[in-house]
């Protein structure tokens, strides 16, 4: 990992993404695979491209991502957060624009734990009146 990379760490649910960006042609590689192969749904690709499209940097950077934990949606959100932070590391003047779109803020929503005596976090056992 030698060279002039800009780095950003992104988190979402239980997923953590380490994002490295450098000047290039717009390739996005996630865990050694092209992004369109790694994310099976189109929504995942759309989510990770949002900060790049907002700042008009879609074909400006080559992006290398290591992401682990969570599912596909959480990983896409973590990658988006990491790309946003890496873009701010590259050029701090992009922060107000990215912040206004809500990409800088870490989405703090986590899965609520299951409670004792309930079927799920809030779902109680079925009640029978008779």
UniProtKB/Swiss-Prot annotation:
InterPro entries attached to this UniProt entry: Ribosomal_Su5_D2-typ_SF, Ribosomal_uS9, Ribosomal_uS9_bac/plastid, Ribosomal_uS9_CS, Ribsml_uS5_D2-typ_fold_subgr
GO terms classed as biological process: translation
Record keywords, A-Z: Ribonucleoprotein, Ribosomal protein
Species for this entry: Herminiimonas arsenicoxydans
GO molecular function, one term: RNA binding
Annotated family: Belongs to the universal ribosomal protein uS9 family.
Taxonomic placement: Bacteria, Pseudomonadati, Pseudomonadota, Betaproteobacteria, Burkholderiales
The protein, known as: Small ribosomal subunit protein uS9
Entry's transmembrane regions: none
NCBIfam families (UniProt xref): PRK00132.1
Gene Ontology CC entries for this record: cytosolic small ribosomal subunit
PANTHER family: RIBOSOMAL PROTEIN S9, SMALL RIBOSOMAL SUBUNIT PROTEIN US9M
Keyword DNA repair: no
Domain of life: Bacteria
Annotated gene: rpsI
The keyword Lipoprotein is assigned to this record: no
